[in-house]
C-alpha cells in the first residue's frame, strides 16, 4: 500500500528506526520493482549519487533492505534477515486476497496487520471481507501472533473526511474492526518518484520525502499514531 511505502520511508530515513521490507506480493512485487528503479537512477545519475553519499555520511544510514519473496517463503526470509542484522520493524507486503493457505499462514505470524481502505465501495467491501477473514479464521482459532488489526483511510478526497466516512466507520465498528484516527489525503504529490528531471520527490525506497511535499500529507502523524500502537518510543 502507498501509505506503507511512506511510513517505512519516514520511519527509516527521518525517525531513525531500522526497517526491513519483505515483498511477498507476487507477481507484482511493486516494492522490489520500485527499489530496482531507484537504484538504477541512483547509480546512473550524478544528482542522486551525491544525494545518496550525503545521506549516508550525514545519517550513517544505508537504504533499508527489500527482500523479494512469496507468501510461502515470507517468514523464513524474515527470520533469515533478522538473524543477519537487528531491525526495529519488519514490514510485509502481502497479496490482497486470502484465498491461499500460505497467505493465512504468513498473516498468522504477523504481530500487527494494517490495511488501507478507500471510500470506493468495491475496494472497501473487498478489504472488509479480507479483514473479516483474518479476524475469523486466524484470531478466533487462537493460533496466531497477531496483537492488533487496523484499517487506515487512504486517498481521502479533500482535507476533511465527509459524512460518508462516518457511515462507513459505523459499519466497520459493527464488524469489530478498528480504524486509525489519521488518514492519508488524495494527492498527486504521492506519485512523485526519482526522475531524471530531479523534481522534489515524495515516493522512494532510498531517500526521505522532500520536506516541502511532506507538509499536509499526514505521514508524520500517521507514523506517530502507529508507533504509539506498537508501543515504540520515538527514535527521532
Where are these regions (language model features)?
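P-loop/Walker-type NTP enzyme "switch/lid" segment
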Residues: 9-89
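Short, small-residue-biased leader/transition segments that mark boundaries at the very start
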Residues: 1-6
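Inter-motif core of Ras-like GTPase G domains
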Residues: 102-121
Amino acid at each position: 500500500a502507498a501509505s506503507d511505502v511512506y511510513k517505512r520511508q519516514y520511519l527509516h530515513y527521518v525517525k531513525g528506526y531500522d526497517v526491513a521490507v519483505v515483498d511477498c506480493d507476487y507477481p507484482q512485487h511493486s516494492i522490489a520493482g520500485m527499489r530496482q528503479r531507484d537504484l538504477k537512477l541512483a547509480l546512473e545519475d550524478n544528482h542522486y549519487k551525491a544525494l545518496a553519499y550525503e545521506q549516508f555520511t550525514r545519517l550513517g544510514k544505508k537504504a533499508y533492505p527489500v527482500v523479494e519473496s512469496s507468501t510461502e517463503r515470507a517468514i523464513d526470509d524474515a527470520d533469515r534477515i533478522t538473524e543477519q542484522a537487528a531491525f526495529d520493524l519488519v514490514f510485509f507486503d502481502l497479496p490482497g486476497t486470502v484465498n491461499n493457505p500460505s497467505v493465512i499462514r504468513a498473516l498468522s505470524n504477523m504481530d500487527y496487520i494494517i490495511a488501507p481502505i478507500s471510500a470506493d465501495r468495491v475496494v472497501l467491501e473487498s478489504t472488509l471481507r479480507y479483514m473479516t477473514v483474518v479476524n475469523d479464521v486466524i484470531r478466533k482459532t487462537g493460533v496466531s501472533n497477531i496483537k492488533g488489526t487496523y484499517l487506515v483511510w487512504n486517498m481521502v478526497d479533500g482535507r476533511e473526511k465527509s459524512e460518508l466516512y462516518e457511515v462507513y466507520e459505523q459499519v466497520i465498528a459493527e464488524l469489530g474492526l478498528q480504524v486509525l484516527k489519521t488518514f492519508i489525503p488524495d494527492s498527486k504529490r504521492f506519485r512523485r518518484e526519482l526522475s531524471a528531471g530531479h523534481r522534489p520527490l515524495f515516493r522512494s525506497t532510498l531517500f526521505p520525502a522532500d520536506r516541502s511535499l511532506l507538509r499536509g500529507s499526514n505521514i508524520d502523524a500517521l507514523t506517530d499514531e502507529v508507533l504509539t500502537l506498537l508501543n515504540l518510543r520515538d527514535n527521532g
